[in-house]
Structure formats: C-alpha cells, structure tokens
Amino acid sequence: MSKNILIILFVLIPFNSFAEDKKTTFNEKLFKNAQLEGKVVVVSSWIKYCSSCASQMKVLNKANKEFDNLEYFAFDVTNEEISNLFKVEYQSTILIFKDNKEVYRSIGETNKKEIYKAINKFI
C-alpha cells in the first residue's frame, strides 16, 4: 500500500511543479504598446497539465530572447476575458500579430523549427 502511494507521489509531484512554471504574462496595455512600437507580438494559450503548452512556452520563451523585435505573452485559456478577446477556444494556440493584425494562428504546434519559421515570416 505505501509503495503505491510513493509511486503516485513520485508521478504527481513533477507534474504539479511543472504546472506552476506556467503563468499568465498577457497584459492588454503591454500588448498594445508592443504593437505601437512595431514589434511582432506572439501570444500563446495554455492550461494546467498541458504538455504541448509547456513545450510551446519553452520554444517561445527562447524565441523571445533570440529575436530583438519580438514580444511574447502567454495566458491561461480558462481566462474567458482574454480567450474571448482573441477568439481562442483551445489551449496550445499560438497567435502572431504584426502591424496590429493577426497574421498567423496555429493550434498544437510544438516543433521549434516550424514555430521559428512562422515567426521569421513576420520579423
């Protein structure tokens, strides 16, 4: 019995700590300011315990550091106000904005090469 409990804890603890790394960084004022500054803006949605969301966030956080003219925001898809603003229904959605317009939308893409290819189209 105690062996089963240890196994369950061993499995669940990493997922719980992994989920804590995700946070909403979206702020409408910062989003608008980044667009006014002429930046390419990337927004992604996530939900707790979504492994593809975590993979996307890892790639997008790295891209945010590598591309000078890029601003990246993330939000919890259960936040209805933000989800409705962008008409996002699913977690792991990536949106790219250029010149105040949505120019790209993807659901579930986690491949770094494909994500960077999409970003490079608009940088």
Go through the PLM ranges and name each one:
Residues 45, 68-81:
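Thiol-based oxidoreductase modules, predominantly thioredoxin-like and allied folds used
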Residues 18-37, 120-121:
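N-terminal leader/targeting and pre-domain segments
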Residues 52-66:
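Typically the conserved alpha-helix immediately C-terminal to a functionally engaged Cys/Sec
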Residues 28, 57-61, 116-119:
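Extracytoplasmic/secreted envelope proteins and their assembly/folding machinery
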Residues 35-48:
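Short active-site neighborhood of thiol/selenol oxidoreductases, capturing the structured segment around
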Residues 4-13:
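Sec-dependent N-terminal signal peptides
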Residues 86-95:
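Structural micro-motif
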Residues 98-123:
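Non-catalytic, surface beta->alpha helical segment in thiol-disulfide oxidoreductase systems
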